Amino acid sequence: DIVFADKIILYEGDTERMLIKSVLQSAEFESLRNQYVSFVQVGGAYGYNYRSIIDFLRIKSVIITDLDYDKDVLTESEILSSCSTNSTINQFAASIISDPCPTVQTLYEWKQRSNPIVINETICLAFQGREDGFARTLEEAMLAKRYGITAVEKKNQNVWKKHRKEDGLKFVIPRDGESDIHSIVSHTARAKTDFMYSVILSNLAEAMLPNYIKE
C-alpha cells in the first residue's frame, strides 16, 4: 500500500483516523483527497521505524503523533520542563537535534524554528505545539482550540456542562470541584471514539482541527 501511494499519513489511533478522514472531505483538502493516500496506523513507539522505507521511496509523508509529556504536571512551567515519553519524537530528536530526551520547551522551539518539522524533504513530524494550548494529546488539543483555553486552565462543572450541551459533545466531567482539559480527557479515556463521533456528528471536525494537524 505504501509503495504505490502518492502520500502517506501515519497516525496513532482510531480517533486520529476518524478526524482525518472527516476533514479530508472538506473543499480545503480537495487536492489531497484526489491523490492516493495511504493511511497507516502506528503506535507512538513505532512511527520512527518507517523512516528508512519512506526515505528510500521518497514519498511525502506525515507522522501525526502525541507529545505525551508527564500527565501529572499541573502548571505551564512544569509542562515546559517535562520530557516527552513518545519514542518516535525522541528518536527523531536524537537524530536531528542531538537530544534523545528533549523537554517540551526544546520541542516547542524545534517546531518554531522549522515550522513545520520536515526531515529529508519527505517526512513531516507533527505533534502538539504551544499554540495547541499546551495539550499532550489529540483530544486535549481539540478541546483547547474549541474553548480557547489551555489544557491546564480550570473551569467549574456548570461551565463544562454548558459547553457539552451547546456543542453536543460527549465527554466525561469529573464530579469534584473545578476541572481542566487534562482531567476531562483522562476521565473520557475509555470513550474517546464516542467523543470523536460526537465531534463529527455535530459538524465540528474542521472547527476543532488542531493546528499541528492542519499545518
Give short role names for the model-derived ranges.
Residues 1-10, 14-215:
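Acidic, Mg2+-coordinating catalytic modules of nucleic-acid enzymes
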